[in-house]
């Protein structure tokens, strides 16, 4: 275990990815909080643009969208934005950190590779490089694990299921 200094820069990042790889990264500025409107402006609008560039024929049409049930994510304006742009929202049961790929895989993956940083800019740069260099197979493997977890969640009627997963 690496002991990190309390004086190292800390950062909040929103990462959007598909089974084929990274789609969009948004680093929150110091002091910035996520509310529904800046979630749309800083995350969902650029995400939608990126997907439309990656998939010029179909864009976001019929694309499944999963995020946890944090307050900004479940706001009516966010749901409306996603629906009007062709996304199908996959509901997230309350209190299920075992279901979100960011929680069960991505953030640990990033932390294991991070080196020490003395400033925010170098930390953002390294996080971006780590994310951009994750092999496509890793995203696919995580997507398959996510599907398994979704099935376990359904079987357990939305209750906690981490203890049922074969590590």
Q: What residue ranges belong to the model's regions?
A:
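Surface/interface recognition patches
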Residues: 1-167
């Amino acid at each position: 275990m690496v002991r990190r200094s309390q004086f190292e820069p800390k950062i909040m990042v929103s990462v959007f990815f598909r089974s084929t790889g990274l789609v969009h990264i948004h680093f929150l500025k110091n002091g910035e909080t996520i509310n529904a409107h800046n979630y749309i402006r800083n995350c969902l609008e650029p995400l939608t643009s990126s997907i439309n560039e990656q998939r010029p024929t179909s864009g976001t049409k019929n694309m499944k969208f999963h995020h946890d049930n944090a307050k900004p994510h479940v706001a009516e304006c966010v749901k409306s934005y996603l629906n009007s742009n062709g996304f199908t929202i996959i509901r997230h049961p309350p209190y299920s950190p075992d279901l979100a790929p960011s929680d069960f895989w991505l953030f640990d993956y990033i932390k294991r590779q991070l080196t020490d940083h003395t400033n925010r800019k170098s930390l953002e740069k390294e996080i971006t490089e780590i994310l951009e260099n994750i092999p496509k197979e890793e995203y696919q493997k995580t997507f398959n694990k996510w599907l398994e977890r979704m099935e376990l969640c359904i079987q357990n009627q939305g209750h906690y299921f981490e203890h049922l997963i074969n590590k």
